[in-house]
């Protein structure tokens, strides 16, 4: 045992020494002074509060400054020129920003997909960056990267496009890449098979989701067998049918200068834009036939355009809104954890009412403060994903409400959406709410065109819709001029109960009975029991008319 010498000169063990130390700690410091730890902490805290209070008295509270007055947004008027071969050259100049976004648009998209070839336009656009007569796919990517950009291609309903954003000094070679991709694609069989396999793999996952099936079904109920009614990305049945010959035929018919637009946004002037366009696209020639025209939708079944602000709603539109309703559709997805609710109405080409439709959509459901989000998410907690979308296509579009919710609450959500739509028809939007929504739209538009890519996107929307590019400058004024009366008249013309398509995808056992109880009593079908139709994913043939209820 280890020994230590005690104060009395006696040996002590380690244990005895530790006991002496403990006794000394309990006795406290010499002289009998005892320190209470809790009291010490309290004293220090009080002193700190006193210091803070003194500082607060020394520096009185200051009212934060008011928001600065709104600043007008300076937007140069876009200009349009044309090459001898018919190519339109549109420029949105942004002096001082040493970037340029270039887009080559072909005014043909998924609407020109032939019967039984859904997804053809999408595949064709995707393959534009997968090899040309002079460059492999990897060479295209390497050259774009060497210029500091990325060569991207895609197709929408009304257009196919290739785009790139580079510095001004790299625009010349970048336009060479764009021209090569659009004019000389090879549609190599190996690349076709690779892209087709990727899309099919994606569809396998997508088709297992309620949101995907609800969206596809809604499109079909909105547009029927007309071009907008088919899946733009294709289906598991249509994609395997598409051949390289199909791709080449579509390219010959629609990829031509008299059906194309070169959009440039950035630090460039008109003369420079036209010179570069002529250098890279001047030799482009289309077939020696009449200009290709994208297949147009037969709009007889859609309501006529809404009146401009200041006039009364047209009788034809009001009559269409009161027409017999389309059957409601439930898609039974057994064991689905949640349901997707979609309520949609068809819209004609909007024309002068684009701003009114945008404001109505903002009030209804386009942001966090909108009515749908306030009622369904914040007040009732029925969804984390609720909103509305305005889809303004060239030949008519739609307003869609989409909600992700529990299966058991799907019917309740449908009723809430119907109530909000009715509210827009029955009651003018209060002035404060209207002003807030318009301010949000104006601010969002200003932010969206801060970059050359955003400016180019706004310009593309106008060109594809067939709206004069000069309307870009008038966007803010048009939004600011929308009145509550105009919103209410638009709602009355297009949001009526007879125009609504209702689709719910999920575990139908949990919502079908309560949903069917809401379905309108009138029906355009011979059998009233067909006002509510339930399908399963296996029977939901989105290419075959006979599988669908009459519209």
Sequence positions of predicted segments:
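Short, low-structural-confidence N-terminal segments
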Residues: 3-4, 54-84
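Charge-rich, well-structured scaffold segments of protease-associated domains
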Residues: 45, 59, 82, 139-292, ...
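His/Glu-based metal-binding/catalytic segments typifying zinc-dependent metallopeptidases
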Residues: 105, 290-369, 538-551
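Mature N-terminal segment immediately following signal peptide/propeptide cleavage
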Residues: 71-103
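M16/MPP (pitrilysin/insulinase) zinc-metallopeptidase core fold and M16-derived inactive scaffolds
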Residues: 101-165, 230-231, 367-382
């Amino acid at each position: 045992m280890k020994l230590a010498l005690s104060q009395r000169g006696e040996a002590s063990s380690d244990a005895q020494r530790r006991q002496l130390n403990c006794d000394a700690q309990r006795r406290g410091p010499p002289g009998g002074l005892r320190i209470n730890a809790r009291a010490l902490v309290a004293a220090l805290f009080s002193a700190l509060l006193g210091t803070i209070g003194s500082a607060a008295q020394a520096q009185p509270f200051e009212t934060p400054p008011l928001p600065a007055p709104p600043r007008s947004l300076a937007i140069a008027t876009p200009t349009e020129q044309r090459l001898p071969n018919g190519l339109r050259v549109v420029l949105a100049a942004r002096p001082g920003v040493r970037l340029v976004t270039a887009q080559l648009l072909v005014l043909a998209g998924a609407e020109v997909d032939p019967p039984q070839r859904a997804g053809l336009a999408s595949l064709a656009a995707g393959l534009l960056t997968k090899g040309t007569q002079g460059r492999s796919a990897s060479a295209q990517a390497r050259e774009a990267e060497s210029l500091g950009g990325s060569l991207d291609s895609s197709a929408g309903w009304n257009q196919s496009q290739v785009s790139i954003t580079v510095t001004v000094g790299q625009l010349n070679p970048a336009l060479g890449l764009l021209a090569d991709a659009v004019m000389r694609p090879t549609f190599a069989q190996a690349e076709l098979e690779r892209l087709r396999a990727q899309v099919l793999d994606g569809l396998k996952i997508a088709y297992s989701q309620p949101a995907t099936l609800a969206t596809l079904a809604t499109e079909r109920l909105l547009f029927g067998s007309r071009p907008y009614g088919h899946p733009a990305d294709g289906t598991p049945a249509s994609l395997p049918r598409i051949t390289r010959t199909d791709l080449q035929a579509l390219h010959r018919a629609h990829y031509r200068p008299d059906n194309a637009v070169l959009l440039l946004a950035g630090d460039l002037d008109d003369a420079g834009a036209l010179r570069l366009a002529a250098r890279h696209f001047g030799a482009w020639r289309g077939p020696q036939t009449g200009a290709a025209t994208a297949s147009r939708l037969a709009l007889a079944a859609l309501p006529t355009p809404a009146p401009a602000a200041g006039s009364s709603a047209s009788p034809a539109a009001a009559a269409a809104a009161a027409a017999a309703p389309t059957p409601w559709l439930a898609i039974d997805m057994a064991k689905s954890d949640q349901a997707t609710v979609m309520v949609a109405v068809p819209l004609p080409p909007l024309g002068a009412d684009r701003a009114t439709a945008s404001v109505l959509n903002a009030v209804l459901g386009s942001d966090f403060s909108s009515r749908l989000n306030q009622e369904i998410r914040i007040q009732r907690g029925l969804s984390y994903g609720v909103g509305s979308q305005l889809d303004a296509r060239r030949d008519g579009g739609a307003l869609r409400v989409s909600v992700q919710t529990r299966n058991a609450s799907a019917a309740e959500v449908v009723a809430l959406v119907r109530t909000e739509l009715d509210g827009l028809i029955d009651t003018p939007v209060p002035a404060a709410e209207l002003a807030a929504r318009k301010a949000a739209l104006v601010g969002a538009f200003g932010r969206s065109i801060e970059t050359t890519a955003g400016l180019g996107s706004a310009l593309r929307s106008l060109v594809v819709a067939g709206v004069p590019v000069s309307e870009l400058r008038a966007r803010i004024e048009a939004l600011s001029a929308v009145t509550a009366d105009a919103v209410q008249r638009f709602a009355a013309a297009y949001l009526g109960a007879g125009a609504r398509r209702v689709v719910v995808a999920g575990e139908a056992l949990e919502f079908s009975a309560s949903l069917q109880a809401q379905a309108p009593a009138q029906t355009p079908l011979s059998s009233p029991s067909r006002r509510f139709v339930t399908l399963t994913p296996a029977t939901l043939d989105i290419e075959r008319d006979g599988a669908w209820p009459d519209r």
